[in-house]
Regions:
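Coupling/switch segment of ABC-type P-loop NTPase heads
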Residues: 1-41, 203, 207
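Switch/communication elements of ASCE P-loop NTPase nucleotide-binding domains
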Residues: 30-204
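Conserved helicase/translocase motor-coupling segment
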Residues: 211-214
């Protein structure tokens, strides 16, 4: 993020330029619908985004947090990183495919889980006209929230596909892509040696050693 953005008033964006924050700032300034959708979602965390005009084409991207008004450069890196994902999600048109790589980076566990709700909101934002998301993630929190929302009926298992990529077993082999069937109640089989197994092991060992020390 930058402290100042020079905006071209003639630009009309439907896809963000990932190399420059100008298009993000332009969309948030000019597109009331997208800005309101973004702020509805950020409002869950007590945040609001706004664009202030300093001089003609010079603008600042501001984050309002409770009683504080902060430049985008002064908030946590996770917020500045996820903001383009939120904007592009709501900006994308029906039938489009948006690809997101590891959106959970620099986000705490609760917000990682809330990403699942964001993505559900995005695909539903065009009513019956679907948007498509391809998300590469290592976040167990995101997957567990998604599983919960399927069980609660907020999204159908038919609308979700989960693939796990296994590393090659030797230098001559290729990575293996495994599709995991998602049941109507949201359950699916975790792959071997994934986080769930480690969490279970760590919890079991923690409890065992607590009792040993008594």
């Amino acid at each position: 993020p930058k402290r100042y953005y020079f905006l071209d008033k003639s630009n009309i964006n439907t896809v963000l330029d990932t190399l420059d924050g100008n298009s993000l700032t332009e969309v948030l300034k000019e597109n009331d619908t997208v800005r309101n959708l973004v702020n509805d979602w950020l409002g869950r965390f007590g945040l609001k985004v706004d664009v202030s005009t300093l001089q003609d084409v010079i603008h600042k991207l501001k984050i309002h947090q409770n009683t504080l008004d902060l430049d985008i450069t002064d908030v946590g890196f996770g917020i500045s990183q996820i903001l383009p994902v939120i904007v592009q999600g709501f900006l994308s048109f029906k039938g489009s495919l948006t690809m997101v790589e590891q959106p959970e980076i620099h986000l705490h566990p609760k917000m990682q889980a809330d990403l699942a709700d964001l993505f559900i909101d995005v695909v539903k934002s065009t009513n019956n006209e679907k948007k498509f998301l391809l998300i590469e993630t290592h976040s167990e929190y995101l997957l567990r929230r998604l599983r919960r929302r399927i069980a609660e009926g907020l999204i159908s298992s038919d609308d979700i596909a989960i693939y796990f990529v296994s590393p090659p077993k030797n230098v001559d082999a290729s990575s293996e892509i495994l599709e995991k069937e998602v049941a109507v109640n949201g359950s699916f089989e975790w792959p071997e040696d994934f986080y769930a197994d480690e969490l279970k092991k760590d919890t079991t060992e923690f409890i065992k050693h607590l009792f040993l020390k008594k």
